[in-house]
């Protein structure tokens, strides 16, 4: 409601999307009952100068944790009807099946929400098994994802210690947040970090046309080719692009290297290269064998 809804141009569609937002509450009771697409159609938002994305969230029940309430009807499992089976099934089973279908069939990227136990009445250890299962499934499928550590104290030493521990354990970014107090800029930062987990399939480099006219084997063209090949060998996902640019900036003949555009949907990044001052005239002088300024 802070970042996506304001970018829906049609007022009626915007109000309908607001009415369809999932409910939330404190305590142990499960609020989500089925996978829900919010909004119904993807909305384009800007994440800064270099990236525009189309966003649609799928809210899932997830995997139930010990102590959660809402999956039982008295002493018996709560039975529910789903689109995936003719007969009613236990709510717990339906929740897991729906979550798996979303992860496998409908999502392009995942946001795993876990907690240190400070935002519910349940201790941290109750969440660990479900957390590990979801992360393992995403890793097995190769889906890019990050983890949100929901906590009442995102800046405390104990939270930072747990955040760092989870990051090392799972090998993905872990962001400590207080979900109830998130601002638009916080959400934008989360989306940026999440999108940068997409695999990098293509790096596009832009530089002056005169460089392309140089003969094969020319020292500058060869040096540029070697530098770009070296960079390509070091990058696997969009998050690695800035590191690659840092390497290029140390190249003697380049004055500047910067990200021109990030295209998460294509798994591509566009990098602009500016050559050192005077290099054009230096090359021209070498070519005609006389000084040109």
Which functions belong to the PLM regions below?
Residues 192-196, 203, 208-293:
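P-loop NTP-binding site
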Residues 69-121, 136-138:
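Inter-motif core of Ras-like GTPase G domains
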Residues 62-64, 116-119, 152-155, 180-183, ...:
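Conserved nucleotide-binding/hydrolysis micro-motifs of P-loop NTPases
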Residues 1-84:
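Conserved G1/Walker A P-loop phosphate-binding module
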Residues 126-132:
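Charged helix-capping and loop-helix junction motifs
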Residues 46-51, 102-106, 137-142, 167-168:
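Conserved catalytic network of the ASCE P-loop NTPase/AAA+ motor domain
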Residues 66-70, 121-126, 156-160:
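Conserved ATPase-coupling elements of RecA-like P-loop NTPase cores
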Residues 133, 137-146, 151-217:
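Canonical P-loop GTPase G-domain recognition
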